[in-house]
């Protein structure tokens, strides 16, 4: 039987080789040739204190660790991934050659600052969902930063929300442009099923009850009700569930942390928000030697 503590060890989500590939890219981006600052400070062994300077949820520890591991430094933490953290507090230390600490400083801080910001916003919406006793799932989207998606999707997990599909190859989502290019929903779903087979879920973006029913009857497992006002959403979702009980209903489009509670309802299974990875406030950290 799996150790219960493993379900809190978020680092197990990401293979080491994946993290190392990203770390190498980030470090080369920040220092593509000479390290002038490193020449100035030398290579004596020093200890830097990691300070949290704004409240939030800690996320991004595996990336922070991997950056300094690559630079022959040792990181020690006083908090665990997913913990609430307060300003101003010491949450860890980095020990190693001072030039290498400074070489990794900004890259590492960028990672945990952004990851923690996403996790903090995600956690606040998870708490709101529990407050309203809504039993559906809050999810992110593919509205992520090119080259940084693995960190952002990981941070959603730490914050307690669903990542949604990771990329175009993870699930087939047929949006308005797919439908218009194909001619109709039924044909688009049929074409998708032919290549996706039994193991690939199909989701269709719909703008009306009629489109939603067509998508469900064509075999889509998930129907996205896009840009619906809350009352229209709940009415449409109830009717759709009454006719197609097994379909998963997702609400999306224009939903944010201020309006999300209006979309909680017994017939809505998923609410997805782009603002989780686009409209968050990074948590402020600094390293002090």
From Swiss-Prot:
GO MF term (any one): nicotinate-nucleotide diphosphorylase (carboxylating) activity
Catalytic activity entry: nicotinate beta-D-ribonucleotide + CO2 + diphosphate = quinolinate + 5-phospho-alpha-D-ribose 1-diphosphate + 2 H(+)
Keyword terms of this UniProt record: Glycosyltransferase, Pyridine nucleotide biosynthesis, Transferase
Any one Gene Ontology cellular component term annotated for this protein: cytoplasm
Associated pathway: Cofactor biosynthesis; NAD(+) biosynthesis; nicotinate D-ribonucleotide from quinolinate: step 1/1
Gene Ontology terms describing biological process: NAD biosynthetic process; quinolinate catabolic process
A matching Pfam family: QRPTase_C
Residues noted as binding quinolinate in the record, renumbered to the chain: 106, 142-143, 164-165, 175, 205, 226, 252-254, 274
Record bears the keyword Nucleus: no
Region Important for hexamer formation, residue ranges: 12-16
E.C. code: 2.4.2.19
SUPFAM superfamilies: Nicotinate/Quinolinate PRTase C-terminal domain-like (SSF51690), Nicotinate/Quinolinate PRTase N-terminal domain-like (SSF54675)
Gene3D superfamilies named in the record: Aldolase class I, Quinolinate phosphoribosyl transferase, N-terminal domain
UniProt enzyme class: transferase
Subunit structure: Hexamer formed by 3 homodimers.
General function of this protein: Involved in the catabolism of quinolinic acid (QA).
Family from the record: Belongs to the NadC/ModD family.
PANTHER family (UniProt xref): NICOTINATE-NUCLEOTIDE PYROPHOSPHORYLASE [CARBOXYLATING]
Name under which the protein is recorded: Nicotinate-nucleotide pyrophosphorylase [carboxylating]
Organism of derivation: Nematostella vectensis
Biological classification of the source: Eukaryota, Metazoa, Cnidaria, Anthozoa, Hexacorallia
